[in-house]
């Protein structure tokens, strides 16, 4: 994954005014100050900075970035397409209004492999517990992760049965899909759903929960809200399993080189996975427009605290969780669930040891 050093950030910051003034073109001459692997990301940085100012030169920079990115990164060409379709930086579709968009992403080969590794990690990390399982799924989406996790835990003897499942998601459509899926798989279990965001209801959740699961769901909150929310939830949980993207979209300022470089890598990789050889497939297109575009545009147009994505590196997660959950809840496991040249996902387990 591309990581900018302080000297790189300084060079990018020095070059941006030349881009904005029109003194610099994406022809490679001024970019000789950059390392070769940074050129595509810098052109994305320049193109999105121009797009944020409604500058007509943005597509040229983004197109030049796409030309050097190759098929594994699709951020530049997708943002250029957004500008062509919408005329400005705006998400083409509303997020999470159609479960099919999320389902397409979750069933990609890379995400299937990631989910399988997450389930394997959970089985390896969680201790055997007698009795029935009470579980809370935060941001459950369409329920696919939990639907794979629960039978694996029971089959491995981590719990004898599943007695109660609480599903939490802000999207009524996603929650409905998840509730139907889990209730069908576990007809003898009590399955309830709440249309809500965790940060709004953490202190009111009944609990207690033997297991709390958060799969790609807690990154929507900035660090201070994560800390406050998890502290409110801590008394109700015994074990916490998280799956998250290893990236820093929490601390960098809007329009900064670090944020642009990270978005170019991580969301560029996601878009390449979604669109791939199926770029004309309407389901793939809907997945990009509904699942990725709202997050991508938010990162490019909204400041910290207001944007929808606040991913954090795993080291910051460990520090935050230790602070929020208190001394009774300890780290019990960490594993890379998916490693690629452009984006990594990791799994975390914290719990109350016997």
Map each language-model feature to its residues.
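A short, conserved alpha-helix within the catalytic core of class I
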Residues: 221-232
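Class I SAM-dependent methyltransferase Rossmann-like catalytic core
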Residues: 90-126
């Amino acid at each position: 994954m591309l990581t900018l050093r302080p000297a790189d950030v300084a060079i990018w910051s020095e070059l941006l005014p030349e881009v904005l003034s029109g003194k610099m073109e994406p022809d490679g001459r001024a970019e000789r100050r950059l390392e070769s692997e940074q050129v595509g990301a810098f052109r994305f940085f320049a193109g999105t900075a121009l797009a944020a100012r409604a500058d007509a030169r943005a597509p040229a920079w983004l197109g030049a970035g796409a030309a050097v990115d190759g098929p594994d990164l699709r951020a530049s060409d997708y943002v250029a397409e957004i500008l062509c379709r919408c005329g400005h930086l705006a998400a083409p579709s509303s997020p999470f209004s159609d479960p099919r968009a999320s389902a397409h992403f979750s069933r990609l080969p890379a995400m299937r492999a990631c989910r399988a590794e997450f389930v394997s990690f959970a089985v390896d990390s969680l201790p055997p517990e007698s009795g029935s399982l009470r579980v809370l799924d935060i941001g459950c989406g369409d329920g696919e992760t939990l639907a794979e996790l629960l039978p694996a835990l029971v089959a491995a003897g981590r719990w004898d049965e599943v007695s109660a499942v609480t599903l939490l998601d802000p999207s009524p459509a996603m929650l409905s899909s998840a509730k139907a899926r889990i209730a069908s798989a576990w007809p003898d279990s009590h399955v309830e759903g709440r249309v809500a965001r965790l940060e709004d209801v953490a202190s009111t959740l009944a609990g207690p929960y033997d297991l709390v699961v958060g799969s790609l769901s807690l990154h929507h909150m900035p660090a201070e809200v994560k800390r406050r929310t998890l502290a409110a939830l801590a008394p109700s949980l015994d074990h916490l399993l998280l799956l998250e993207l290893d990236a820093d979209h929490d601390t960098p300022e809007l329009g900064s080189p670090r944020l642009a470089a990270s978005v170019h890598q991580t969301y560029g990789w996601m878009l390449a996975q979604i669109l791939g050889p199926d770029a004309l497939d309407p389901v793939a297109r809907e997945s990009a427009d509904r699942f990725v575009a709202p997050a991508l545009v938010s990162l490019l147009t909204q400041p910290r605290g207001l944007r929808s994505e606040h991913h954090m590196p795993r080291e910051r997660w460990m520090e935050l969780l230790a602070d929020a959950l208190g001394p009774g809840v300890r780290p019990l496991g960490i594993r890379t669930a998916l490693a690629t040249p452009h984006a990594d996902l990791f799994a975390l387990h914290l719990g109350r040891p016997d």
